[in-house]
Design a protein with these regions (language model features):
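Sec/Tat signal peptide C-region and signal peptidase I cleavage site
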Residues: 19-25
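Short glycine-enriched, charge-decorated loop/helix-capping segments at active-site entrances
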Residues: 38, 127-132, 446-449
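Outer-membrane beta-barrel pore domains
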Residues: 287-466
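Outer membrane beta-barrel
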Residues: 95-283, 350-386, 393-406
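Bacterial N-terminal signal peptides
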Residues: 9-18
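Bacterial N-terminal signal peptides that target proteins for export
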Residues: 1-9
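Residue-level detection of beta-strand scaffold positions
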Residues: 44-45, 60-62, 106-108, 174-177, ...
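N-terminal periplasmic/intermembrane-space "pro-region" immediately following the signal or transit peptide
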Residues: 25-115, 362, 366-379, 466
């Protein structure tokens, strides 16, 4: 359309100037040439306009695409931000082993421990036992898992495979009824006392004090509750027996166990005061009990003091416990009385034991951890691998046990123990112990029938857990 108008205008101009007259014939060729040039210029202009229009369309299309992409990016960023606000479906944390936790409240964590012991116990003159002298063993090899279930529930299942077999240790379900009240059903520890309830991972010596091993403390099947309010902890439960012993359908034992703890902060220190009470009905017509203890270490299967079997219908135990932690220093001690009720008019003996212990960290900034009425995991201030040497602790313990009463002469012991504990990182420990034990009226006679003698024991342990 634009070219046609220009052509008509050009013809009109030519006619007005006399382009059609015969006198101007000589100029026709020049005019025609000019018109041709004008047409070429107009065609070029039209082509340029078409090109610009095409480029404009392309630019519009690109702008639209950019706007669409920007909108998509904005939407994607908003979605990512919203997703970031929501917890991951499954989170993984590391606490010695991976712990898997879901947004719905489930969690699962494998757990285990390995304790390898070696040691030697001297042999009094005249006593020959292959268990004395040097020995070594895998003291514990636990494998299991624990976790949480939505609704305030929790669980733990664990076995010990150290002794060429499988022994169930913990196997229970928990319920946190409120912030203060927790319930447990299944196989777990009754509430004996401070050292017994403290995990063997966190002990001061390789073995617990004699009073905590002589009277048959063990995990039992039962139902229990723990109430905590401020500085006070109240624990109680009803138990039968260890699940392995319940394979005997004649085992009808039933016990009631309770413990109260008062644990206030005193200045810069943590105080622990407690007491426990235990009553157990054996519920068997031919029932008996036996109290005895190894010489400081677990490697020898020999007991220098031993009551032998005592016919019994029930047991009554009661104990006191105390502890204090301030900075690198700790002190703790327990006493326990165990009374045996015998059938008919037989005399009811009462046996007694206790220990007193002090300890000190030699490394700066380290302290014995305390939590929920028991001693807890030591976390070195300067662990190996982070520029430090870990935590080093020295412990001293006096250990007493009296198994003589009511006509039963099982012997007495006075033990003097020293231990060195090195914790390079919180999940690994190395322990070295020495114990000197003096026996009177011992169960095993030495040369010439002598029942008053002493033994020395040295033990070491390497352990890790996860």
């Amino acid at each position: 359309m634009t070219i046609n108008r220009l052509t008509i205008s050009a013809l009109a101009v030519a006619a007005a100037t006399g382009w059609a007259a015969p006198a101007a014939a000589q100029d026709n060729a020049a005019v025609a040439e000019e018109l041709a040039q004008m047409r070429a210029q107009m065609a070029a202009m039209a082509s340029r306009i078409d090109t610009l229009e095409s480029q404009l369309q392309v630019a519009k299309a690109e702008a639209q695409a950019a706007t669409t992409a920007a909108g998509a990016a904005t939407a994607s960023a908003a979605a990512a931000t919203e997703a970031a606000k929501k917890p991951a479906e499954t989170a993984i944390a590391w606490k010695g082993a991976p712990e898997f936790t879901t947004a719905s409240g489930w969690s699962f964590k494998p757990r285990g421990r390995l304790q390898v012991d070696a040691g030697t116990v001297s042999s009094p003159a005249g006593i020959t036992d292959n268990g004395l002298g040097f020995g070594s063993e895998v003291r514990r090899a636990y494998l299991g898992f624990d976790g949480k279930i939505p609704g305030g529930f929790g669980y733990r299942a664990e076995i010990d495979i150290a002794n060429s077999g499988v022994e169930i240790t913990d196997l229970y379900l928990t319920y946190q009824a409120s912030k203060s009240l927790g319930l447990t059903i299944g196989q777990h520890k009754a509430f004996w006392g401070l050292e017994e309830l403290t995990s063997d991972l966190f002990l001061s010596m390789t073995e617990r004090a004699a009073v905590n091993t002589a009277f048959g403390y063990e995990r039992r099947l039962g139902v229990s509750g723990t109430y905590s309010a401020g500085d006070v902890i109240v624990q109680g439960g009803v138990f039968t027996d260890n699940v392995a012993d319940l394979n005997d359908d004649g085992n009808n034992a039933l016990s009631l166990d309770g413990r109260v703890v008062f644990a206030p902060k005193v200045g810069n220190g943590q105080l622990h005061l407690g007491g426990s009470l235990h009553w157990r009905d054996l519920n068997d017509s031919a029932a008996s009990v036996r109290y005895r203890v190894r010489p400081f270490l677990h490697t020898p299967d020999v007991r220098f003091i031993d009551t032998g079997n005592i016919s019994a219908v029930s047991e009554l135990g009661y104990g006191l416990e105390a502890g204090y932690v301030q900075g690198p220093f700790h002190a703790t001690g327990e006493t326990h009385w165990q009374k045996v009720s015998r059938p008919g008019a037989l005399v009811d003996p009462t046996f007694f034991g206790g220990y007193a212990e002090v300890g000190m960290f030699l490394t700066k900034g380290d302290t014995r951890a305390y939590k929920g009425g028991t001693f807890d995991r030591i976390k070195p201030k300067n662990p190996v691998g982070k520029g430090g040497m870990g935590a080093v602790q020295v412990n001293l313990r006096y250990d007493y046990l009296d198994l003589i009463d009511g006509g039963f002469v099982g012997g007495t012991q006075n033990g003097y123990d020293i231990g060195l504990v090195w914790t390079p990182i919180e999940y690994i420990r190395f322990m070295l112990n020495y114990g000197h034990i003096e026996y009177d009226n011992a169960f095993l006679p030495a040369a010439g029938g002598d029942r008053s003698y002493s033994v020395d024991a040295v033990g070491a342990r390497a352990q890790f857990d996860f």
